[in-house]
Amino acid sequence: MKKHSPMKKNKKTKFFQLIDHRVCFDYLLGFYVNAFRRELWCNNLNVINKKLMKTSGTWSTFDNTCFFIRIFCSAFKNSNAFICAKPLSVNLSGFREWSNLYPFVEIVRLPEALDYYRSEGMNFWQYAYTKNYSLRNFFNYFFKILIGGKKMGLNYINFKNHFLKNLIYPNAWFSIFYYIWRKVKLEVIR
């Protein structure tokens, strides 16, 4: 079975050092991979926007998708963290009712999570590096969303925030070439 994190050794670190694709590709969006002090969690529930959290539609707002990231930042941003290299649970993947939204999650919700981490104190250079990496599939996923329409989350996209603001990152543009390279590589293998 493939591990969620590529980490091979346990590591003590600071909270924001967890936000790295070399630690966890989803930047803590996979809630099931986290263990934390419940008391700190409960003491910081006030940061949630309950009105936006109740918005209908799977992954429709940052708050109904990533509410726990707001809590994590409020509760743990000044805390030490521990990365356990050996998996403590088995989490299987298979059918996901939101699988058609994966491109949307990767190029909209993950960058939004990084923006939020930055607003809560993440180092600028770490933010820029990580955000650039997160946009490695930007154009091909954006076109998939445009073609797929509402069922792929097009109705949740804010063109200015989710498209234009990401064009300053090199990987947004390189994503075109990455996509072509992967396609050519697949054809050569066949």
For each predicted feature, which ranges?
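Conserved donor NDP-sugar-binding/catalytic core segment of glycosyltransferases
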Residues: 1-9
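Alpha-helical interaction segments
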Residues: 5-6, 31, 114
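Intrinsic-disorder/low-complexity, polar/charged segments
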Residues: 8-15, 123, 169
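Conserved nucleotide-sugar donor-binding catalytic segment
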Residues: 10-101
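C-terminal subregions of glycosyltransferases and related glycan-biosynthesis enzymes
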Residues: 70-73, 77-190
